[in-house]
Amino acid sequence: MTIAEIKNTVEGKMDQSIEAFKHNLTKIRTGRANPALLDTVHVDYYGAMLPISQVANVSLLDARTISVQPWEKGMGAKIEKAIRDSDLGLNPSSMGDLIRVPMPAMSEERRKELSKVVRGEGEGAKIAIRNLRRDANEAIRKAVKDKLASEDEQKRCETDIQKVTDRHVIVIDQLVAAKEQDIMAV
């Protein structure tokens, strides 16, 4: 693998790590309603456990309420039970064929707890980025050892990869700060 290929590959993988981190952040509850919050909740649909989004229309009713509109009449009670039994601390209420899921206000203690979870997720993402940097640097050293690149190219490439790593770590820090601010907002 050439030096340029190594640099492009590591940058692509770092971008994927950032996207995965962003996806993980959407699952962490803030004070506002977010339909993605119910992505982790699965409901029994004729023997198969499916995400709610595959058996109902999930949307926002207002800033603090998620509405779930089942596609089949008989699924309302099952969806309501699945949401109630999830560990999200939500209490859905059924209004005919529409299920309303109000978001309860979080206590200060719960906000701090979620803030710690966000920081932990951020640290995990940074570790993933650093591991990618380490793997890329090892691949570069191997290329130099196999006489596919010079030592000058190695130093230049390692510097470039460090800059890319620093950029991605800054993005993670910004995402963590924004999510913490979102969580701590009353």
Curated annotation (Swiss-Prot):
It holds the Pfam family RRF. Transmembrane segments: none annotated. Keywords: Cytoplasm, Protein biosynthesis. It comes from the Bacteria. One of its GO terms (cellular component) is cytosol. InterPro entries: Ribosome_recyc_fac (IPR002661), Ribosome_recyc_fac_dom (IPR023584), RRF_sf (IPR036191). GO terms for biological process: cytoplasmic translational termination. Gene3D superfamilies: 3.30.1360.40, Ribosome-recycling factor. It is found in: Cytoplasm. GO terms for molecular function: ribosomal large subunit binding. Responsible for the release of ribosomes from messenger RNA at the termination of protein biosynthesis. May increase the efficiency of translation by recycling ribosomes from one round of translation to another. Belongs to the RRF family. This is Ribosome-recycling factor. It comes from Albidiferax ferrireducens (strain ATCC BAA-621 / DSM 15236 / T118) (Rhodoferax ferrireducens). The lineage of its organism: Bacteria, Pseudomonadati, Pseudomonadota, Betaproteobacteria, Burkholderiales.
